[in-house]
Amino acid sequence: MGNAMSKDVYLAPLERAAQNSLILGLFLPIQSGAWSPSTAPRGTSWTFDYNARCAVRAEQLGFDLVFGLAQWLGKGGYGGKMQFRDKSTDPLLVTAGLAALTKRIILISTVHVLYGWHPLHLAKFGATIDNMSGGRWGLNVVTGYKKSEFEMFGLEPMEHDFRYEMADEFTTVLERLWLEDDEISLDGRFWKMKNAYVSPKPINGRCILVNAASSGAGLAYAVRHSDLIFVTSPVGADPHKACEALPPHNAKIKDGARQLCRTVRTIINPHVICRDTEKEAWAQHKAILDNQDPVAADNFYKTFVGGDQASWKQATREQWVIGGNVHLVGTPEQIVDWFIRLKQAGCDGVQVNFYDFLPDLEYFGQRVLPLMRQAGLRAGLTAHAA
């Protein structure tokens, strides 16, 4: 079987999620400190047990997917007294563990595919987790960009567009290994194989593919291969400005996919701070900022604005202390209003994160999700029925 057939027919779990007007995902805090270099009180933990509780509860509440980021940091992480992100677990292994604890929710793993991976390895590992989960696994393809990370693996840093040339060949081979019934031999520009074969195949033909590119080369790659594309506000964390800037960005991505006879969906990452009153929500926002670890915050901020990631150039230091791409602060009604506006701006989904994950997730489930259903953003648990 070749790649000529539309890839969309293979995406049953994602298509079920898309029965909702707004796809709903949860970022998992698999690194110490999660998204916020702050010492304001919270119980968030990087441990597998804590993240398993988050994933299981998200599934019970009707979330469509959970997602873990990947990173490679030296001793002490981003530093500071809190040693921000000194500990981080591997998302591929975490999602493999979650496959045994969940039944319906999509499990997305982030993998830096250029840090020594061969497509055959990842095709086999991915197909295995996909079968373990009943067809619910997806891959977030990351090329890497930090000089220090490449050096950890004994590699020279690679030029930005060249990374996506490598990723394009890697992903093409990956898809062939999942989709084709014959052994594959390849003498490629970057990878070689002889009589390579993967069995069992992913349950739905091939696994869900995700990417968070924003540059020209990155988006060209993403619309060719990805089913779900993370978009980043090009104007920073202010949701008012984001909702004004996102429509042409989302339209450009979807138009690019349509030219290739493909369908892609876009999803954005809001950090949600929700309380009964607006005053309480902004008080929590202030507490996170007031208790920031200044050394960790500085290092975290400089890492992103100093790299070649086009999407983060407008981010402020305050944004990195709070975490997430856009900041949604307010009452349950206000949060839902922002979700509606993000939907109107062309986003097909939101991938939320919190400061104090389990209690904030529970509050979100009890207070925000019912309003999302009332607003027509969510169809309820029926979208997840097997």
Regions found by a protein language model. Give the residues of each.
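Hydrophobic, small-residue-rich alpha-helical packing segments that form membrane-like cores
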Residues: 7-13, 25, 40-41, 98-106, ...
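Glycine-rich, proline-tolerant flexible connector loops at the mouths of alpha/beta enzymes
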Residues: 65-89, 113, 233-246, 352-365
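N-terminal beta1-alpha1-beta2 module of alpha/beta enzyme domains
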Residues: 2-101, 201-207
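An alpha-helical appendage that flanks or caps ligand/catalytic pockets
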Residues: 3-30, 59, 160-203, 233-344, ...
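Conserved, mostly hydrophobic/aromatic
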Residues: 24, 58, 62, 98, ...
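Active-site mouth loops of central-metabolism enzymes
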Residues: 34-49, 110-120, 156, 203-216, ...
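Acidic (Asp/Glu)-rich catalytic clusters
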Residues: 16-19, 59-60, 96-104, 126, ...
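Hydrophobic faces of well-ordered beta-strands that scaffold small-molecule active sites
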Residues: 22-26, 66-68, 107-109, 137-141, ...
